Regions:
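Bacterial N-terminal signal peptides that target proteins for export
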Residues: 1-12
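Terminal low-complexity, poorly structured segments
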Residues: 12-16, 212
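Transmembrane beta-barrel domains of Gram-negative outer membranes and organellar outer membranes
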Residues: 25-253
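C-terminal segment of classical bacterial N-terminal signal peptides
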Residues: 17-25
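Intrinsic low-complexity, intrinsically disordered segments enriched in polar/basic residues
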Residues: 5, 15-18, 38-40, 164
Length: 253
């Protein structure tokens, strides 16, 4: 892909970010918390966004543009911007992240990648957290896969370190529909018990074409506040021209 085409895609992603609402930092695959090991083709871009509302009246809105570059091997660079209300207080954070695939996924074999990043308060510039995670994916067949996440989180606001964990299952049960269920969380010491309790999400993704998909998700305790959540998410993709469709390469939506 030429430099001009790459700049055009990045500009489009940033333009969409300018008007999409944004939410609580989540280093993940769209609105799902457990990431897969796959990344897109070098030169491709996408914009993920989602709105989440909790029974506790907490609210989260997120926009996450990303592009895959190839300085020495493909690396996915993303800049998640989040705007959220928790216990009646609003906050905005920015979360840069870089993800690299180490071993490709395939049917009957384990693939894995590595990502790392941090989060910052958009108003004060304060460094809020740092994290590093290894996502692994085992494809059972062309339509089912298991995702495993393990990593580290440093919550600088309370100066505590946590072990991150997650397991998820994806099933593409039609050409346009995929079901996901996942459990995840962080292990360590916390003054708030719900922060270290397991978290849960399940939802359905509808992808009618190569460009657009939408997710509808139910979640429990997804940000450590012991509430029920409903999330509506979308993804807009900017594939490499004349490239093989993503779901043919990965088997999933």
């Amino acid at each position: 892909m030429g430099i001009g085409a790459g700049c055009t895609k990045i500009a489009a992603a940033v333009a969409i970010l300018a008007w999409l609402p944004a939410g609580k930092a989540r280093a993940a695959n769209g609105a799902y918390a457990v990431d897969a090991a796959d990344i897109g083709e070098a030169g491709s871009c996408k914009v993920e966004s989602w709105l989440s509302s909790a029974s506790s009246t907490d609210f989260t809105a997120v926009a996450n543009p990303s592009c895959v570059v190839n300085p020495f091997r493909p690396v996915e660079l993303s800049m998640l911007t989040s705007h959220s209300r928790s216990d009646g207080e609003w906050g905005t954070t920015i979360q840069p992240k870089a993800k690299m695939n180490i071993a490709p996924t395939g049917v009957g074999k384990l693939g894995f990648s590595f990502y790392a990043g941090g989060s910052f308060d958009a108003l004060t510039g304060e460094n809020l957290s740092a994290f590093a995670v290894i996502p692994a994916t085992f494809r059972l067949n062309e339509t089912m896969r298991l995702n495993f996440n393990g990593g580290w989180l440093w919550d600088r606001s309370v100066d505590r370190h946590y072990l991150l964990y997650g397991i998820g299952f994806d099933w593409k049960f039609t050409d346009t529909l995929q079901w996901t269920i996942e459990a995840f969380g962080q292990a360590g010491q916390s003054d708030t018990p719900s922060v270290v309790r397991p978290r849960f999400q399940t939802g359905v993704r509808y992808r009618p074409n190569e460009i657009f998909s939408v997710d509808l998700i139910y979640g429990r305790n997804i940000s450590g506040e012991n509430a029920n959540w409903i999330t509506l998410g979308t993804t807009i993709r900017f594939p490499v021209p004349d490239s093989k469709p993503e779901h043919y390469r990965t088997g999933h939506l």
